[in-house]
Amino acid sequence: MLRTHAAGSLRPADAGQTVTLAGWVARRRDHGGVIFIDLRDASGVSQVVFREGDVLAAAHRLRAEFCVAVTGVVEVRPEGNENPEIPTGQIEVNATELTVLGESAPLPFQLDEQAGEEARLKYRYLDLRREGPGNALRLRSKVNAAARSVLAEHDFVEIETPTLTRSTPEGARDFLVPARLQPGSFYALPQSPQLFKQLLMVAGMERYYQIARCYRDEDFRADRQPEFTQLDMEMSFVEADDVIAISEQVLKAVWATIGYDLPLPLPRISYEEAMRRFGSDKPDLRFGIELVECTEYFKDTTFRVFQAPYVGAVVMPGGASQPRRTLDGWQEFAKQRGHKGLAYVLVGEDGTLGGPVAKNLSDAERDGLVAHVGANPGDCIFFAAGPAKGARALLGATRIEIAKRLDLIDPNAWAFTWVVDFPMFEAADEATAAGDVAVGSGAWTAMHHAFTAPKPDSVDTFDSDPGNALSDAYDIVCNGNEIGGGSIRIHRRDIQERVFAMMGIDHDEAQEKFGFLLDAFSYGAPPHGGIAFGWDRITALLAGVDSIREVIAFPKSGGGVDPLTDAPAPITPQQRKESGIDAKPREDKPKEDAKSKA
């Protein structure tokens, strides 16, 4: 080893020892005839002092981020010179030897200052030398180990599934890889290990997991990555409660890495209740504002805006004092979310109602409104009216925005809930309008995915009454973030074919794209279920950072570009020719002889 000790490990008990440290020059300070540097490695920082002779002369050429090795004697700092901000703040190393292991060019940004994201990603290897980004990756490693430990205790088998597979409709666009040996044909990078993990259950593995890389060619969305990581799990001979129970053990171990004792079991809420109370299927439960149903209250109204299939409200405490410009800003807030506006009523300190909506209400509607929605003098009541799904979503977004503006969210709180009893299907046009990909050509598409089993009560009726069919699905939500989702899977060929047909995937297409799965279901497939955790999002929450880019070693920018390597990049004409991108696929693709040697 080029060093005897880690820089962050030295303490007063080490005084008198001769040590060799290796790391980077974080700071250099000239104090008269003495030079101090902060020497940083992965463990922390130690102060090194160069006082005399050749070692002092050599230290004059040191600059920020030079990589060095220093030998010296550990000394207790003089009284009054201690630094209580760092663990090594009571000692320093009196240098006797200095070796420059690698010089540094002038830095594109100072590591102790905040740099722009583009520069940070382009020089990510420098960015990761900083304490915050570097520790985020170290935390991620601990999180991986914690999850693996729990799953090993419960007899899970870690299995790697293919990253070169065939393109199947799973809810997003595939990244395609040309198959050079079969010109005109393409592999697809997996959007998830979903189909392979189900095949592993058919294979009798019973308990599977992997920390899986997944790929989705999606349109730009804030804080999304084209390649991301899941903790993927699947179990045979289980019901939803069994998957939830083991998932909670994983979450408890993972949150213990930051010293938080997660109380179990976690609460559960139905999808219908989550939408009704919070306007979201991933409700943030760290604060108490809830939506109020007003449809029945306004059933006889003459106000045309409220003559709608759904009318709801959310109360902003103290919101009546907002200036007109701020209230106008709420209208823009609604328009950005695809709505015409956000109606409001202001409750005066004397209880009188103001604002443009109040004058359109009847005396009876005005008299009982404050009590109905639970408002107080000085509050603002926001309304949304229209189809229930869209209006509730607007009120749910308004609820979150109110909490942010009023500072109602405790940043140190953890609020978990399972959301259960999801609809099995959603209207395809609604899915498309929300920016999702509607799989199949039917009027209905799967809300989770096509392999989610219906609840027992919906098995016989989901194709005749799709709007009321419930799936045996469950999502886990933390602080308003969906951090995992799973379900009991379909394990019967006949039910899977009915689901495909419901989604507009006909028999021939189903056989072409999913025949391998359907065939497997013909050989004694066990009941099974599982879950996939968004590992990047979970790690970001644990690290206390806003973006998943902070917990990925070499992330892409928001547009899917890697500033470090300048990927994606054009290929050469020769590469294009060799890959067979433009070739017409042969209809009689060669098949591997099952008897041939591997």
From Swiss-Prot:
GO biological process, alphabetically ordered: aspartyl-tRNA aminoacylation
Keywords from the UniProt entry: Aminoacyl-tRNA synthetase, ATP-binding, Cytoplasm, Ligase, Nucleotide-binding, Protein biosynthesis
Binding site for ATP: 216-218, 225, 482, 534-537
Catalytic activity annotation: tRNA(Asx) + L-aspartate + ATP = L-aspartyl-tRNA(Asx) + AMP + diphosphate
GO cellular component: cytoplasm
Pfam families: GAD, tRNA-synt_2, tRNA_anti-codon
EC number: 6.1.1.23
Cited PROSITE patterns: AA_TRNA_LIGASE_II
Molecular functions per Gene Ontology: aspartate-tRNA ligase activity; aspartate-tRNA(Asn) ligase activity; ATP binding; nucleic acid binding
Subcellular location: Cytoplasm
Signal sequence bounds: none
Residues covered by region (Aspartate): 194-197
UniProt-listed InterPro entries: Aa-tRNA-synt_II, aa-tRNA-synth_II, aa-tRNA-synth_II/BPL/LPL, Asp-tRNA-ligase_1, Asp-tRNA-ligase_1_N, Asp/Asn-tRNA-synth_IIb, AspRS_core, GAD-like_sf
Site, as annotated: Important for tRNA non-discrimination: 31, 80
Domain of life from the UniProt record: Bacteria
Family, as annotated: Belongs to the class-II aminoacyl-tRNA synthetase family. Type 1 subfamily.
Role, per record: Aspartyl-tRNA synthetase with relaxed tRNA specificity since it is able to aspartylate not only its cognate tRNA(Asp) but also tRNA(Asn). Reaction proceeds in two steps: L-aspartate is first activated by ATP to form Asp-AMP and then transferred to the acceptor end of tRNA(Asp/Asn).
Subunit composition and interactions: Homodimer.
Protein name as it appears in the record: Aspartate--tRNA(Asp/Asn) ligase
Organism, scientific name: Mycolicibacterium smegmatis (strain ATCC 700084 / mc(2)155)
